Amino acid sequence: MIVTTTNSVEGYQISEYKGIVVGEAIMGANVVRDVFAQITDIVGGRSGAYESKLQDARETALSELEDRARALGANAVVGVDLDYEVVGQSMLMVSASGTAVVIG
């Protein structure tokens, strides 16, 4: 499945729009607390443990986005946008949204 932030896929024509799809992942309170507890992991102002958790959440959100697009019969998702939101006091939500399409 092709997933892109652009509104089209070079070399392909969009033949059908299937609708908006969204994938989400939430890092729970314990994960965020554990990451900040490992602050000694910081090198050059960056936390490897925190970045790893963010990457996992981003990959989960994108995987869920692809699964939902496949369920609609799409073979690509265009116009993908990633958002990061703090939920409550100690949770982080990563959401990926885009338009499921059929390209050929």
Swiss-Prot record:
Q: What Pfam families does the database record attribute to this sequence?
A: YbjQ_1 (PF01906)
- Its transmembrane ranges are none
Q: Give the InterPro entries listed for this entry.
A: UPF0145_dom_sf, UPF0145_YbjQ-like
Q: Which family does it belong to?
A: Belongs to the UPF0145 family.
* Descriptive protein name: UPF0145 protein TM1040_1243
User: What is the native source organism of this protein?
Assistant: Ruegeria sp. (strain TM1040) (Silicibacter sp.)
